[in-house]
A protein has these predicted regions:
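Amphipathic alpha-helical segments of tetratricopeptide repeats
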Residues: 61, 105-109, 143-144, 163-175, ...
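Short secondary-structure boundary elements
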Residues: 1-157, 161-169, 174
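Tandem amphipathic alpha-helical repeat scaffolds
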Residues: 86, 124, 141-147, 164, ...
Length: 317
């Protein structure tokens, strides 16, 4: 048989300890004793073991777990990821979901600091419990938490996990209607676009794909603020690829969409986009004249406290 089969057979030789391994397997490769004890005691858990500690020691003696003391807490680690997988997969799917739901409840009730520092941990258990709406919010929270730490690749992975979950709940065997589904996806796609620009650059194919999907959503929702942001993003995408004609056409669309009485910040962004294109086309007198108008609008408008990318600084570049 496979190594997985051999590991499962070793667990089967310790039937009571196997139940403790199943709880530990649901918690992850490494888990603190306080957490497994709290889950074992939780009313919603499908597994309740009257004497947990001797069973954990039996798993240590069998070479399936290691134990170490870190300060005041005792940590258990599966010796190999395959041991953890064998324990986790040996449960019925129904019981696995119930166990992950219990873990999520315990984390929220008794391990708030852990949830704050590792929101992806809670999101993972909520997803594995089939708590789709909670997991979706959790993955978004984890992405924003990672982005605040400039962990951009980690944040991107969390957002892609959220989008995959959203797709799973829209179509397929796990389909379940979620309120505000398209608005949620649009928010996630906009956040993802910024992260991809940071890690891959404005001209990356993935950035274009995210913008295209987000445009479909924004048009369907009639979200003018999002459409403005996305058009400017697409203008930047084509500009950075050297397609000035396409960038100019989109910048014209942006200006036309603003109407006769545009919001000052939106007008400033559109004007700067035009000026930037003119400059790189070598049309310097036109670029300078438009940039001067942008700076005049900027000085009158007082936009500094409300923007991430300072348009006045961009005009001076």
């Amino acid at each position: 048989g496979t190594l997985q089969d051999l590991l499962t057979a070793r667990l089967d030789q310790l039937p009571q300890a196997k139940r403790a391994a199943q709880v530990g397997g649901a918690l992850g490769r490494v888990f603190p004793q306080a957490l497994i004890e709290a889950v074992n005691a939780h009313a919603a858990s499908p597994i309740h073991l009257p004497a947990l500690d001797p069973l954990l020691q039996a798993l240590v003696q069998a070479g399936l777990l290691t134990a170490e003391q870190q300060g005041e807490q005792r940590l258990y680690t599966f010796r190999h990821a395959l041991v953890r997988d064998a324990a986790h997969q040996s449960m019925l799917e129904r019981d696995r979901r119930r166990l992950h739901a219990a873990i999520a409840a315990v984390l929220q009730a008794h391990f708030a600091a852990l949830c704050d520092s590792q929101p992806e941990l809670l999101a993972l258990h909520q997803e594995q419990a089939g708590l789709w709406a909670e997991a979706l919010a959790g993955w978004e929270r984890a992405a924003r938490h990672a982005a605040r730490r400039s962990a951009h690749h980690e944040a991107t992975a969390h957002l892609k996990r959220a989008l995959a979950l959203l797709a799973r709940t829209t179509d397929g065997p796990d389909a379940a209607p979620l309120p505000g589904r398209d608005a949620t996806e649009l928010r996630l796609q906009l956040l993802l676009s910024g992260l991809l620009i940071t890690t891959q650059g404005y001209a990356a194919d993935q950035v274009r794909a995210v913008y295209d999907r987000a445009l479909v959503l924004a048009r369907g929702l009639g979200d003018e603020a999002a459409l403005h942001k996305l058009r400017l993003g697409l203008e930047g995408y084509h500009f950075m690829r050297g397609d000035f004609a396409r960038a100019q056409a989109i910048a014209d669309e942006v200006t036309a969409s603003l109407g006769d009485h545009p919001e000052p910040q939106a007008r400033l962004q559109a004007s700067w986009a035009h000026a930037n294109i003119l400059f790189h086309q070598g049309r310097l007198p036109e670029a300078v004249a438009l940039t001067d108008r942008c700076l005049a609008d900027y000085r009158q408008g007082g936009h500094r406290a409300t923007t991430v990318q300072d348009a006045g600084v961009m005009c001076l570049c």
